[in-house]
């Protein structure tokens, strides 16, 4: 399951119909990749962050990995979720006149705490 499923993205954008599902899916993928790039995450790191499994009660199951503790993983996921939703909302609202430089600067600020290579 993805970190942010389509139904959650649509809820965040306040979109009720399925008319724009394809567009929202494309923008969601772009927002995810942009956030991964800005955070300087490797493919392995993103795979761990993006792999979420739930039990029958809807609780997140622990992920076997050597990169993060469960607490760190939860923190990184939360930061990534906020950044991805922000980027998605920005791209959705500014389809025609998006200022990608301003978006990237905002994402750097949002992702600073998990950004790789920042001392």
Whereabouts are the PLM-identified features?
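Divalent metal-cofactor coordination and adjacent catalytic microenvironments
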Residues: 1-119
